[in-house]
Curated annotation (Swiss-Prot):
UniProt keyword Coiled coil, yes or no: yes
Keyword RNA-binding carried by entry: yes
UniProt remark on domains: The C-terminus is involved in the formation of factory-like inclusions.
UniProt keyword terms in alphabetical order: Coiled coil, Host cytoplasm, RNA-binding
Region (Involved in the formation of factory-like inclusions): 471-721
GO molecular function: RNA binding
Stretches the record annotates as Interaction with sigma-NS: 1-13
Record PTM text: The N-terminus is blocked.
Protein name in UniProt: Protein mu-NS
Organism: Reovirus type 2 (strain D5/Jones)
Subunit-structure text: Interacts with mu-2. Interacts with sigma-NS; in viral factories. Interacts with the inner capsid proteins lambda-1 and sigma-2, and outer capsid protein lambda-2; in viral factories.
Coiled-coil blocks: 523-556, 632-686
Region feature Interaction with mu-2, mapped onto this chain: 14-40
Length: 721
């Protein structure tokens, strides 16, 4: 018998090989069949009935493995119209348990969702495409989002057939025939038992079977997805965190390609080739409050053509660098919260169905938490949330990042019980004013120097833009710290100015009548640059020295005017060595420190003696009172001891008397017993000596007893009636 590439001649259908599960276990997405024998419930009930009828209480116990029907592992085969079929498997959540009743219809629907070309390559259809490697629950989520976005319908058991019909009608104009490669993939799935249809056996002993096996093995587009294959939760959450900070390229682009592409079509982006901000055409979505000022959260000009539209304009030529649709959180969050409770569709669901990237302002996050309607706002699988709408504002201030992160972790009901103090600290710190003031200092910088932070590759150039420093000459101590690692090619405007200045310098040199040799001109140029640099450094040094002089004067003035006066009039008893070190740290003179320490020691001794006297006076009366009470208690104890001794003597006398009486009574008892024995013997002797004979009896005849005839014989029954 011939064999080829793992297909043996004795290959049998999978349905007949229930005991051999080694190959099935290794197959991705297929669960091994249970080895426990099935239980015949009818036979068990019959056996139990007979045992009860015959009076037998000995019923054998049989262990039955009951599967959890609510978490059943389901395997489906998705057959796209222009690609190879693949298998997905997993558990269906209890919320979607009704899908277990309509698995064939679900497979049919997923085939459409996995074929976006059937809908004329719609962007919405591409966004929710079911792909190989998805888990079953992710595929169901993609299907539900597809129905929500394309059909504006909610998936339920009642309208499932209607949804299938609508999808077929919508795709009727774009459906293509399945390719030959897709059919080959179906055969491979059936071979490994992953298809719901009957498995087909390939007989490799025949030339046709061998060619069929070769065709299956060499097919390129066949993909068997792992049943439980899914995006790593750590990669997914890391990607969400990067989008939240406006760093989309820092996310894993093998999973977030479409979201990243949409991001750079919406948000301000710098084009280094044109040397200007890109004129964006696609509109994004902003969730904000009605009373917040959006102009304080961006470095661009803000244009509001109407109540629902916001444009960000370039500060140089006023072209549009970003377009947004403004939605007030007060109008959509409460209705969305109510719709979630009644299992209905809300306006926010419709808005989220048409976009992948949404901006939420920090004020909107605080509003939904304060009013208890935050569930389902930021924690959505098909939407990536960005805090704020200007990347520079979010990365400079980090305002709202902590609130958004904690809302992505848990529902508000859990946070109010487990993280209540954390929420309180995030909501009541009132840092918005300080952050807005800090961001105004960023805006005051050169507009051209800030453009590099809107470059798509900013994931490697972004550092902390703002940091706090406690300096004496500034209240907030906020400085702009540009990342020194960015390259000059990120600042083309500066490069252009440098080229123009070099050209201008060459023209000036050629026009001047400087007799300096050409070889020395570069050295002189460097010398001039060094001279200007030295001049600048000298100016900085002078400025720093002036600041230091002013600070020293302030310290001396504060020391002489306030600290010395305080130490002179302050009464303190702390004479520890650490106090001397602290006064030395604030620059107190040594003689003053010694005088203060001696004064404190004397004051401490004085107070110690005073407290000792007051304490002894206060407690002397209590000590006398306790001594008197102690004497009284000792006298009472002595009296009690005497009375106890008397009682013991009386008890001893009573015991002696009782003992004597007991001895006397025993002697008398013994005498009585002896007397009794003696009398008994005498009585017996007298009885033996006296004999009753017939001569002693009377010869008089016995007379009848009077009234003997009237006696009733009770042995004879009589009728009492």
């Amino acid at each position: 018998m011939a064999s080829f590439k793992g297909f043996s001649a004795n290959t049998v259908p999978v349905s007949k090989t229930r005991k051999d599960t080694s190959s099935l276990t290794a197959t991705p997405g297929l669960r091994a069949p249970s080895m426990s024998s099935p239980v015949d419930m009818a036979q068990s009930r019959e056996f139990l009935t007979k045992a009860i009828e015959h009076g037998s209480m000995s019923i054998p116990y049989q262990h039955v493995n009951v599967p959890k029907v609510d978490r059943k592992v389901v395997s489906l085969v998705v057959r796209p119209f222009s690609a190879g079929a693949f298998s997905i498997s997993g558990v269906i959540s209890p919320a979607h348990a009704y899908l277990l009743e309509c698995l064939p219809q679900l497979e049919q629907a997923m085939a459409f969702v996995a074929s976006p070309e059937a809908f004329q390559a719609s962007d919405v259809a591409k966004r929710f495409t079911i792909k190989p490697g998805m888990s079953l629950q992710d595929a169901i989520t993609a299907f539900i989002n597809f129905v929500s976005a394309m059909l504006k319908m909610t998936v339920t058991r009642q309208n499932f057939d209607v949804i299938i019909a609508e999808i077929e009608r919508l795709a009727s104009s774009g459906v293509v025939n399945r390719t030959e490669e897709a059919k080959v993939a179906d055969e491979e799935l059936m071979l490994f038992g992953l298809d719901h249809r009957a498995p087909q056996q390939i007989d490799v002993s025949e030339p046709v079977g061998i060619s069929r096996a070769v065709e299956i093995q060499t097919t390129n587009n066949v993909h068997l997805a792992p049943g439980l294959g899914n995006i790593d939760p750590e990669i997914y959450n890391e990607g969400r965190f990067m989008f939240m900070q406006h760093k989309p390229l820092a996310a894993d682009q093998s999973y977030f390609t479409t979201e990243t592409a949409d991001y750079f079509k919406i948000y301000p982006t710098y084009d280094e080739h044109d040397g200007r901000m890109v004129d964006q055409k696609q509109s994004g979505l902003i969730l904000c409050t009605k009373d917040e000022v959006l102009a304080e959260q961006t470095i661009f000009k803000l244009d509001v053509p109407d109540d629902k539209t916001v444009h960000l304009l370039d500060r140089d030529d006023d072209h549009v660098v970003a377009r947004f649709t403004r939605v007030f959180i007060e109008d959509v969050a409460p209705s969305h919260h109510a719709a979630q409770r009644s299992n209905q569709r809300s306006l926010l669901d419709d808005l989220y169905a048409n976009t992948q990237v949404v901006s939420v302002t920090p004020s909107a996050l605080r509003w939904v938490i304060k009013h208890g309607v935050s569930d389902g706002i930021v924690n959505r699988k098909n939407v990536k949330i960005c805090v704020g709408f200007d990347p520079l504002y979010t990365l400079a201030t980090s305002n709202g990042l902590s609130l958004c992160s904690i809302l992505m972790d848990e529902k508000l009901s859990v946070l109010n019980s487990a993280c209540k103090m954390t929420l309180r600290s995030l909501l009541k710190t009132h840092r918005d004013l300080d952050l807005h003031r800090a961001f105004q200092r960023v805006i005051s910088q050169s507009y051209a120097s800030l453009m590099c932070y809107y470059h798509p590759s900013r994931k490697l150039a972004y550092g902390e833009l703002l940091f706090m420093s406690s300096q004496s000459d500034t209240v907030d101590g906020i400085k702009l710290q540009l990342d020194a690692s960015r390259q000059c090619h990120e600042c083309p405007l500066l490069q252009q100015k440098i080229v123009e200045l070099e050209k201008h310098l060459i023209v000036q040199k050629s026009a001047s009548s400087d007799p300096t040799p050409v070889a020395l001109q570069p050295l002189l140029s460097q010398l001039r640059e060094l001279s200007s640099e030295v001049t600048r450094l000298q100016m900085d040094l002078s400025r720093t020295q002036a600041i230091n002089t002013r600070l020293e004067a302030d310290v001396k003035s504060a020391q002489s005017c306030s600290l010395d006066m305080y130490l002179k009039h302050h009464t303190c008893i702390n004479s520890h060595v650490k106090e001397d070190e602290l006064m030395d740290a604030v620059r107190i003179a040594p003689d003053v420190r010694q005088e203060l320490m001696l004064k404190r020691k004397a004051t401490r001794q004085e107070w110690w003696e005073r407290i000792a006297r007051e304490t002894s006076t206060t407690f002397q009366s209590k000590i006398d009172e306790l001594t008197l009470m102690n004497g009284k208690q000792a006298h009472e104890i002595s009296e009690l001891r005497d009375s106890v001794t008397n009682y013991e003597k009386q008890v001893a006398e009573l015991v002696s008397t009782i003992t004597q009486n007991q001895t006397t009574y025993q002697q008398e008892l013994q005498a009585l017993v002896a007397k009794n024995i003696e009398l008994d013997a005498l009585n017996q002797r007298q009885a033996k000596s006296v004999r009753i004979t017939s001569s002693l009896l009377s010869a008089t005849p016995i007379d009848a007893v009077d009234g003997a005839s009237d006696l009733i014989d009770f042995s004879v029954p009589a009728d009492e009636l």
